[in-house]
């Protein structure tokens, strides 16, 4: 009997450039492979035994001749290389038109509407920036004037940063809800609240970030599961990404270690349904900051935490580990990279095998749909291959 399926998304842990990566400025990107070489090798015994070394060339993680999980990689069919696009495609929504980006900052009509409708005293920034850098550059002026820091990136995001002593958290969230409504017609994927704390020169972002996503333009596999009475637990930023559609329970997390511990605890009480987990630290703390050493430590932390999750799985359960895009910390860019993503599928007691290169992330959603007996419109299920 199919009971529980766990998806762990190692946010940004791509495994090699897609054929069209050059068009995105990402030729040669390989988040996992390049990170391993930058640090002189990774120690990932659990992931190695699962077959991660078959997915791309990872220094320190050779291909295991008898992997314990099924291994492969997935290519993104949608245009883009961001969190929203990647997660939506995983759950059966392929975007034919990329989401809107603003490489020159946001036009006056957006900024003026934001200021007018929120009552904010203006904005600072309105540029493409690294979030950790711009709060150091503008944080003191923000605290003096009360103006929030607005910025974007190569992704379709409108980010609003504010010090929690200057703009209360709930006020920041309210401003972002207003921005979400303003930006819906502009096809901006996410409005992100970026609270920070600290003193000038030592500002630090908190885990109270909140994403306000535009709703998916089509029905996702998650919604079909809920309609069929299947519980769906969203861990980390999963509920935000899907605008809380197709989610029956939300679990907030404070980083990867917390998310992994909460996932293990969930498996002690959840006896049926989908547990969908996003592990954001790879992307937020290390990929965007071009920190391969930190990225390597996070991968090794994941490896150490996996046994507590795998040991809680029983006959009929499945676990899939994947990513939503790349964010190669070894390249000059601090933005996401257009990459394949790894696919490891663990079925207790069934050994492993090669799932090849899937032509869309939606193959994962199609597999989830078949596992729980609901319809999917996009992708090819590999359920038979991992349960034979």
From Swiss-Prot:
Pfam families: Metalloenzyme. Its EC number is 5.4.2.7. Pathway: Carbohydrate degradation; 2-deoxy-D-ribose 1-phosphate degradation; D-glyceraldehyde 3-phosphate and acetaldehyde from 2-deoxy-alpha-D-ribose 1-phosphate: step 1/2. InterPro entries: Alkaline_phosphatase_core_sf, DeoB, Metalloenzyme, Phosphopentomutase_DeoB_cap_sf. GO terms for molecular function: magnesium ion binding; manganese ion binding; phosphopentomutase activity. Its cofactor is Mn(2+). It is found in: Cytoplasm. It comes from the Bacteria. GO terms for cellular component: cytosol. The keyword Metal-binding applies. The keyword Isomerase applies. Mn(2+) 1 binds at residues 11, 324-325. Mn(2+) 2 binds at residues 283, 288, 336. CDD domains: PPM. It catalyses: 2-deoxy-alpha-D-ribose 1-phosphate = 2-deoxy-D-ribose 5-phosphate; alpha-D-ribose 1-phosphate = D-ribose 5-phosphate. Binds 2 manganese ions. Belongs to the phosphopentomutase family. HAMAP family: Phosphopentomut (MF_00740). Isomerase that catalyzes the conversion of deoxy-ribose 1-phosphate (dRib-1-P) and ribose 1-phosphate (Rib-1-P) to deoxy-ribose 5-phosphate (dRib-5-P) and ribose 5-phosphate (Rib-5-P), respectively. This is Phosphopentomutase. It comes from Anaeromyxobacter sp. (strain K). The gene is deoB.
């Amino acid at each position: 009997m199919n009971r529980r399926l766990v998806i762990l998304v190692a946010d940004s842990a791509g495994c090699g450039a897609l054929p069209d990566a050059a068009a995105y400025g990402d030729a040669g990107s390989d988040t996992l492979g390049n990170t391993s070489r930058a640090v002189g090798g990774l120690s990932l015994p659990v992931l190695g035994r699962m077959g991660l070394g078959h997915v791309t060339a990872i220094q320190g993680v050779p291909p295991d001749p008898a992997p314990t999980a099924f291994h492969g990689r997935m290519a993104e069919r949608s245009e883009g290389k961001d969190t929203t696009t990647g997660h939506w495609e995983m759950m059966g929504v392929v975007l034919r038109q990329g989401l809107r980006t603003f490489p020159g900052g946001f036009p006056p009509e957006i900024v003026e509407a934001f200021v007018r409708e929120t009552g904010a005293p203006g904005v600072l920034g309105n540029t493409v920036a690294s979030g950790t850098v711009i709060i150091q550059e503008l944080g003191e002026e923000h605290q003096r004037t009360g103006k929030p820091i607005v910025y974007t990136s190569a992704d379709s995001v409108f980010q609003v940063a504010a010090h929690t002593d200057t703009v209360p958290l709930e006020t920041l969230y309210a401003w972002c809800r207003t921005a979400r409504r303003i930006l819906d017609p502009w096809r901006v994927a996410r409005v992100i609240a970026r609270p920070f704390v600290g003193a000038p020169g030592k500002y630090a972002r908190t885990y109270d970030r909140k994403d306000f996503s535009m709703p998916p333009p089509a029905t996702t596999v998650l919604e079909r599961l809920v309609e069929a009475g299947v519980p769906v637990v969203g861990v980390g930023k999963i509920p935000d990404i899907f605008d809380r559609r197709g989610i029956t329970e939300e679990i907030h997390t404070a980083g990867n270690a917390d998310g992994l511990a909460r996932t293990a605890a969930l498996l002690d009480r959840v006896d049926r349904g989908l547990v969908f987990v996003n592990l954001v630290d790879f992307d937020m703390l290390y990929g965007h900051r071009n920190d391969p050493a930190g990225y390597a430590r996070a991968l090794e932390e994941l490896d150490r935490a996996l046994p507590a999750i795998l040991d809680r799985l029983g006959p009929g359960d499945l676990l899939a580990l994947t990513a939503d895009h790349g964010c190669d910390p070894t390249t000059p860019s601090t933005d996401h990279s257009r990459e394949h993503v790894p696919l490891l599928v663990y079925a207790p007691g069934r050994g492993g095998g090669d799932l090849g290169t899937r032509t869309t992330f939606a193959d994962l959603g199609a597999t989830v749909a078949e596992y729980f007996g609901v319809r999917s419109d996009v992708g090819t299920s590999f359920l038979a291959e991992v349960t034979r």
